[in-house]
Amino acid sequence: MRRIVNDRVKNMRDLGGYPTLDGRETRFGSFIRSNLPTGMSNVEIDRLLKMGLSTVIDLRTETEVKRKPNILNIRGINYFNISISAGFPQREEDIPNCYMDIVLNRDKMRLVFEVMINSKGMVLFNCTAGKDRTGVIAMLLLKLAGVYDDDILADYEVSYTYLRDEIRLMHVNNPDLPAFLGGSKMENMEMFLNLFNSKFKCIDDYFDYLGISRDGISVLRERIVL
């Protein structure tokens, strides 16, 4: 994992560099996970274009997009708004089930991965904080690559490290918000992984569930693994 440093976008990270169970490594420059790209300078945007960015998948709802447009929805980038709800957990222990609701949203998830399969160049996918909806997509990509579960958990947990100042401010400004909102505890991703593994025997079974062809699965795996 390598963080892409921007002044305003704190949780933008390349999924490259993770070791896999078969002794390989995930590719740099294929997939970027991110919180909402906003307030970026022309220099920062140009740097992404020079890295090969060609496609942006914005996972936010239409209401979220209208409230805060994605700064990367520009000429030269293929922008897709595939609206997925993050759910509304009432308690922290509800989070893993909310993540399962995301992966079981067959139509939307199939669209996400079909865009990735058909894209040429680097793909950036984002939601608002870049940790829940984005974290679920990142987990699926890393699992497809054969990345160790410990690294999948670490990739999820580090979101809070980069977002903690914004999250603290959110709670100061909204004191009635439940304390768990904004966090990215490893235990929540671990429980989600357990739910996922009990539902699907292997990651290929999940992509079969989505209706992704075997050729499509191979293309996606080849894009993320060296």
Named regions from a protein language model:
Residues 129, 133-134:
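Ser/Thr-glycine-rich phosphate-binding loops at phosphate-binding pockets of nucleotides
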Residues 1-124, 137-226:
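Cys-dependent protein tyrosine phosphatase-like superfamily
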